[in-house]
Regions:
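C-terminal catalytic domain of Rieske-type non-heme iron oxygenases
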Residues: 1-154, 158
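Rieske [2Fe-2S] iron-sulfur-binding domain
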Residues: 158-251
Length: 251
């Protein structure tokens, strides 16, 4: 939707995580409803950092991204988005340069920029679709009430062979793992912007990281280790009995 697209344009923080082949790090210089300016690093070793600026006209669904300094300085990418229907959006992308480009290199610039923008857009579509799906799930979970105080997950020996097991419940999605010999459960949804935590691996420090923005959480307590957002939703308790694993929602 257009709402997700405008939300994505303002979200500078996702660049090194969703677009890891194009960016390795980013730090915000300033931001607001007008857009943002940030310093971004590239994966290529030895490449100079870029200062990027995105200016957004929310009323017109229009934004322009400019390379203020660093590789590609002076390049501008202007995007106009138009709604065709509730689920279809047409975008018009145009490339400009505030510095003169030799005529024999114009085609190369256009090809490189077109390929990179197509990749970035495809990666963003996955994020925007995932975000909308997560919002729909949250709305449904808010309406639901669990009729059971306990849910059977499955055979504990079989589950132990898997790195993780995702359990859908009427009130949320949870990930069940065996950590250091103990069964635990944690929310499979990031508390920041609802990023997916169902396919994450456990880091060496016992944390898990959101693939959208890199926010880290203690897998056992749910605490956000970056101090940037609230803790993960409280998970149900894991109970093992007679070779079976259960999620218990009893207090």
């Amino acid at each position: 939707s257009m709402v997700r697209m405008m939300e994505n344009a303002l979200d500078w923080e996702h660049l090194p995580y969703v677009h890891a082949s194009s960016f390795s790090a980013i730090s915000c210089i300033s931001q607001g409803k007008w857009g943002w300016r940030a310093k971004a690093s590239q994966p290529a070793h030895g490449e100079e950092d870029q200062v990027l600026e995105l200016l957004l006209d929310l009323d017109r669904n229009y934004w322009a991204t400019c390379v203020v300094s660093g590789p590609g300085q002076g390049i501008e990418i202007h995007t106009q988005a138009n709604s065709l229907s509730g689920s279809e959006i047409e975008i018009d992308v145009r490339f400009y340069s505030s510095t003169e480009i030799p005529q024999d290199q114009v085609g190369i610039y256009v090809d490189v920029l077109t390929q990179q923008y197509a990749l970035l857009y495809d990666e963003d579509v996955a994020l925007m679709s995932g975000r909308q799906s997560a919002l729909d799930d949250r709305e449904q979970w808010a309406r639901e009430k669990s009729d059971s105080s306990e849910i059977l997950v499955g055979d504990s020996q079989r589950l132990a062979k898997s790195e993780r097991t995702i359990v859908e419940t009427p009130t949320g999605r949870f990930c069940v793992r065996k950590l250091n010999g103990t069964w635990i459960a944690h929310s499979a949804t990031c508390s920041h912007l609802l990023g997916p935590l169902d396919d994450t691996t456990v880091n060496a420090d016992g944390s898990i990281s959101c693939p959208w923005h890199g926010y880290r959480f203690n897998i056992e307590t749910g605490e956000n280790l970056d101090g940037k957002c609230r803790a993960l939703d409280t998970p149900p308790r894991v109970r093992e009995a007679q070779g079976k694993l259960y999620l218990s929602f009893e207090a």
